[in-house]
Amino acid sequence: MFADGRPAGHSRCDSRPSGAGVALAFEGTLGAPRPDHVVAGEASLDAGSCWARVRVAFDGLSVPLDVPPDVLLEIEGAPALVGATAQRLVRAGMRPGQSRDIEVVRVRSDRSVTSIAGRCIWVGGRDWQLILPLESTGFSVRPDGAVAGVEAAALLVE
């Protein structure tokens, strides 16, 4: 839900094997019942769940994007992509209750791209927390890397 009570929209992400990695195709809408923005794109992950290629468009306009291989990719309207980072952290030995500093590349519906230093916490089971300056977001990741749910971002007050 948006702050004004409107539904936030919907999203989907399909994956298929691609060489030693995975190819993802994603799409989503922001706003309902009539979307304010539409996001669509494709991403490739290598065998280590690192980003190999990412293409994103909002409302049909391409977003120029150069994504480092080991960032958490947060695309407005496409929350499923954070699951790839959770899988990568688990493969690197992260355990429940542990946290890691991580770079977050955030892509917004206005086509802005920012890089933010954050902290990713594996709370336990499927539950993860992303802590950024002044905000916190929870997400639930299935063992296959699919994001099963996203908790609304909370604004933190200093």
Predicted features by range, described:
Residues D46-S136:
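Solvent-exposed helix/loop surface patches that form functional interfaces
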Residues F2-P64, G145:
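N-terminal mature ectodomain segment of secretory-pathway/periplasmic proteins
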Residues L24-E27, S49-W51, G77-A80, A153-L156:
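Glycine-rich loops and low-complexity Gly/Arg-rich segments
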Residues M1-A3, G28-A32, V107-R108, G124-W128:
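Intrinsically disordered, low-complexity segments enriched in polar/charged residues with Gly/Pro
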Residues E42-A47, D127-V157:
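Gly/Pro-enriched, hydrophobic low-complexity segments
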